[in-house]
Amino acid sequence: MRNGAVQQMNSNPNASLYPWSQRRLTYTTSHPSPFPRYGAAVNSVASKEGDIYLMGGLINSSTVKGDLWLVEAGGNMACYPLATTAEGPGPRVGHASLLVGNAFIVYGGDTKMEDSDVLDETLYLLNTCMSLFIGVLG
């Protein structure tokens, strides 16, 4: 260990037990927080720029969302809705996502708003450089 690491552990003896840290997100005044949210899709590893994408989910135990948010974790922790140039996956809960290079991939989840609705089996790709969603039929 380096001297700085030893000093840090000495100042906080439980540092190795609690490796998590907290940072506040910053929102623009025109956009309220998207949290709390249940069943949203979030990339498990940030992009090389530190970007985290959050799509859809359930808020207030009753409203299913299909919105897309970006958290700039590599910078000032800005959090804001991301506009796309094509229609995205739409409202859903419990879907899966993966970030591969510049593609945020979304699949599945509960998309039924009415009992007669059919589940969406389309695989969606978001080109994160162009903010463009592309649907690939399954």
What are these regions, as identified by a protein language model?
Residues 1-138:
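Kelch-like beta-propeller repeat domains
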